[in-house]
Design a protein with these regions (language model features):
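Non-transmembrane, membrane-proximal soluble domains of secreted or membrane proteins
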Residues: 2-204
Length: 204
């Protein structure tokens, strides 16, 4: 106004909520719709998450394979398990993965070379550790770190799990398809973090 006073164009009253700006239907919609979406996403992810975090004692992948009888995992996909199906195996093999700045090391234990073999390969013009596994088998990797926190990411398999100094963590490696891919560290672990990689081969 001309005398410098601002008129109360919205007819607001001190201490009174402006009800004419309220929209109950809209508020219910933006509360209920995201809630239902979260419930749906939880439902469709439950089976694969339960599968990849399966117990090593009689879970989806049975018990540890009998090495003396050269037992195979016989990994297969059960379409009738859960909404989207799940991987299962008669048994599994165990391996060990150790991380330290800035290299991975693999221990196949008593497994035959056909089931698991470690060595070196070339990636980005450098010699890097290499792990070779046999397709059609399930592996349970026991992992630890000798120094700082690392996070091995099996790129093609889409699995990742942190490894911590002084602790042992596990991850299931389901070797289904014949392929080659990288194992990368996805937790910053120092100056050469970007070069901490290994080659992984799944062979027939």
């Amino acid at each position: 106004s001309e005398d410098g006073e601002n008129p109360n164009v919205d007819d607001l009253e001190v201490g009174v909520f402006p009800v004419h700006y309220d929209d109950l239907k809209l508020e219910l919609a933006w509360t209920i719709v995201p809630f239902m979406l979260i419930v749906y996403l939880t439902y469709i992810s439950w089976a694969p998450l339960d599968n990849i975090w399966s117990s090593p004692n009689g879970g989806s992948f049975g018990d540890e394979c009998d090495y003396f009888n050269n037992e195979s995992s016989d990994l297969y996909f059960d379409e009738d398990d859960g909404l989207k199906g799940a991987y299962k195996a008669n048994c599994y093999h165990t391996i060990e993965i150790t991380a330290k700045q800035w290299v991975w090391s693999f221990d196949c234990g008593t497994l035959e070379a056909e089931l698991c073999e470690s060595g070196f390969t070339e990636a980005d013009g450098r010699a890097v550790p290499h792990l070779s596994l046999q397709a059609g088998n399930a592996y349970l990797a026991y992992m630890t770190s000798e120094d700082v926190t690392h996070a091995p990411w099996f790129v093609s398999l889409g699995v990742k799990e942190d490894v911590l100094p002084g602790q042992t963590t596990t991850v299931w490696i389901l070797a289904e398809d014949v392929e080659d891919f990288l194992l990368l560290c996805t937790e910053y672990c120092g100056d050469d973090h970007a070069y901490m990689m290994a080659g992984v081969t799944i062979h027939a």
